[in-house]
Amino acid sequence: MTDTKKKLGLVIHTVWFWIAWLFFVPLLVQYLFDSENYIADFLGEIITIGLPAQLLISYRDKSKEKKEYLYRIEDVSLKRLPHKGLMVSMLSCMLLFLFVTYAINTAQLVYYLRTKEFYSFSTVEEFHLLGFTMALIINALLPALLEEILYRGLYRDTFRNHNKFIAIFIPSLVFASLHSNIIPMSNAFLLGMLLMILYQRSGSLKLVIILHAVYNILGIIFNQYVSLPFTTLSLFNSGSNESQIVYALVISISVSLLSLVMIFLSVGYCFKGNNPAMKINRNKSGFMDIIMIIFFFISAVLMILLKITNPGAA
């Protein structure tokens, strides 16, 4: 019965996410802001994920005598995890970023060779410290915190009595389905699978929050400010000819395959034989509320500074 209630809570959240994302968030942007900006992104993240996650964590099961919390989030201190496991898990996260980047790049290069039309998902922008800081907070750190609490923490607790494949696949599929199109969905699905595997093997929610944040930061840096070698953007900016593009395609395929093999090896190694005792965190301290207030305050201050120093910025 308890598992049914947990699943119902997650289903309700998924329905709420789509209602809020399709109706409330666009209205928020339309009537409160001139265009999409970091504050709108922040409020959208809070409305669709932050507040619902807080409500689910705070919900008490009234059918039990002591009215215990319905969801229980497992979390092991990072200090209790082996250093090699921590380093290898970080490496596996970076390898996944390389795999996704060069797999997409391979598809773009093949598309160009067949159609002679250039297409890239990345853009190189001029670096502004304030804008970069805002992107780190709103688009990297905040989603990592809220999404891991929900899609790894709460889903892990809900599916703990199912087999490992279901416990990994279902949360990753739901996590991916909430992204906009096929490329972000595929990226989110692979990331969700990796993070859930590492969460199951380590028992540390803090670890997967950090890994998710690192992955987001890599995406911001290499999709907006720096182009990796042999990618479509770097090739066409340098005026490469067709033979150079074919060479880049071979490199891109090789990097993708090598990264994929190394991911499997690193995940198999992470925390091998390690089975730390789980620590139950019932969120009695109001941690989520404090974090949301801090993020809102910081983002509001930075947004004001951004408008003052660069009035044309979003």
Residue ranges: model-predicted function:
Residues T2-A20, K67-T101, A277-S299:
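Interfacial transmembrane-helix boundary/kink motif in multi-pass membrane proteins
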Residues V11-I12, W16, L43, L86-L91, ...:
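Hydrophobic alpha-helical transmembrane segments
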Residues W21-E65, L249-L257:
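Alpha-helical transmembrane segments in multi-pass membrane proteins
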Residues F23-V29, P184-L249, V267-G268:
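Functionally important transmembrane alpha-helices
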Residues L32-F42, R72-L146, I304-A314:
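Juxtamembrane helix-loop-helix connectors linking adjacent transmembrane helices
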Residues V246-V261, D289-A313:
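Alpha-helical transmembrane segments of multi-pass integral membrane proteins
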